Amino acid sequence: NLRRIGGFTDIPFLPIMGMDEPWRYRNKAQFPFGRNKNGEIVTGFYAGRTHDIIPQEDCLLGVEENKKILESIKEYMIENHVAPYEEETHQGLIRHALIRKGFKTGELMVCVIINGKKLPRSEKLVEKLCRFDGMTSISYSINTDKTNVILGKELVNLYGPGYITDYIGDVKYRISPLSFYQVNPVQTEKLYGTALEYAGLTGGEVVWDLYCGIGTISLFLAQKAKKVYGVEIVPQAIDDARENAKLNGLDNVEFFVGKAEEVLPEQYEKNKVYADVIVVDPPRKGCDEQCLNTIVTMAPKRVVYVSCDSATLARDLKMLCEKGYEVEKVRCCDMFGWTTHVETVCLLSKLHEAKHHVNVTLDMDEMDLTAAERR
């Protein structure tokens, strides 16, 4: 895609960051519930391009606890006559189960998504789930809409603080059911370490982190930068980001709620903020054009682009390179073993800052200065 869409023919690719252990690497899984042809409660995964559930209580990409947690939820449903959700009729209660685990802390989270306002006899579910070592947070999410979106807007906490914690490197993060947090923490540490390396921080820089989520990259950067500003559209993610900054004793980070393409121009035009480095980690649709234009206007020395979609990455790199930047290096990270998807991190530098540029030398003796003076 970088060649086909971006027109790049000579990109300096570095070796792919592969996975040492491509099994049991996912810290998050979401399982739909339903019934089979015999009317029995089943959970598993959707068949490709359908919403037909293939019964499967374990997956070698997920954590080992998933299987027994799902068995416990099914037991609770059967014993307490709680029906699974039926998409065709919009009847039934249990839609999905979300399970997360902190790889370094061992903390477990279970969030059950329901088609209703209340989970009956919820204490029975809590009792079953609390048998698992590391169970830290149990909640349910209310989602009564006819939608493919899994989580609802309202969360009800049943047990624990409503979140779990985990570490990437030596940075601690608070993770709620709604938090965006990379699903492969081992590879994430490699990815963010590379982004930090590309940022080239010496301690005196001002950095903007766009699409910052719960501050995962922001807090990595804050350890090496003078000041970091993070921007994220999801208010709860920013709440988590601010808590994460406090959790790590970092007071040189400031977070804004809003669209990157609106917050960045506003801060630049009204408050005259500047940036030595800008880091972007957008969703699959890539960066908004107005956001890219503001980046170009602010003219940071370096732009670090973290991407989960090579097509939109190619489009955005092409635009930045047409407006004064050059791709210095690109490196892919195998974040999703046994799939065709990778994360990519790119370093762009201002042309006059780039290592590769063209020098033009003019011989003053050969120039017609007389003509220039007459003008």
Question: Over which residues does each language-model region extend?
Answer:
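Short, solvent-exposed loop/turn elements at beta->coil junctions and helix N-caps
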Residues: 14-22, 87-88, 96, 100, ...
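Short, aliphatic-rich beta-strand segments
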Residues: 99, 106-115, 172-176, 277
